[in-house]
Amino acid sequence: KKIKVNNTLNFLSNCSNLVRKASKIKAIAITGSSGKTSLKELLSQCLNKIASTSYSKKSFNNKFGVPISLFNIQKNNIFGVFEVGMDKKGEINHLTKLIMPDLGVITNISYAHIKNFKNLYEIALAKSEMINNIISGGSIVLNKDDKFFNFLKNKSLKKKLKVISFSEKNNADIRMIKITRKKSNYLLILKISNNVKKFIIKESLKFYIVNILATIAVISNYTDVQSLKENFFY
């Protein structure tokens, strides 16, 4: 049966938001200038080991992709991981209103989307639109190695969000201490709050340490990371 509507995109967006409102998932929205898709893939795989997880397919991160991803939410899903992209100011605001994230992640701020912006500050401002749409009492995961960390942190604290930081080199909630070779794999040693945690990772993940740190930061919002097995990422 065909339904005639005045605006297909608005109809798609409104219906997808109804699906989201009807669900009880913990929605996680990921944005940033780079690393969104690879983080989304790793995070969704890891969360799925904890509980049923819905996630954006491929790079479904625009005004069409996000609504389609929301339509894929199933009744048994506990988590939902959604990638959010942008080409212009206001786009992240629109998409995260649909997602209604329980937790947001901003990977980094760089010149990846400079064509419609004058400078990095304008990009950071556009990315920070997510902060306004994280649910009351929600959380945000931020990269402490990014030059806009304090800017994003301060905006988040004004909204009374819980800020979870991660870093490869600076003191943070989730911090890499060191990574060493262990036979054909690698031993990754992290400092999580005041505790040390070790993970065995495949060689292929050695180049995605930032994604591992961000993933652990997200998971720490929902469960005790110390309970994860050493081979959790294997």
Where are these regions (language model features)?
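Phosphate-binding loop of NTP-binding sites
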Residues: 9-144, 148-159, 217-220
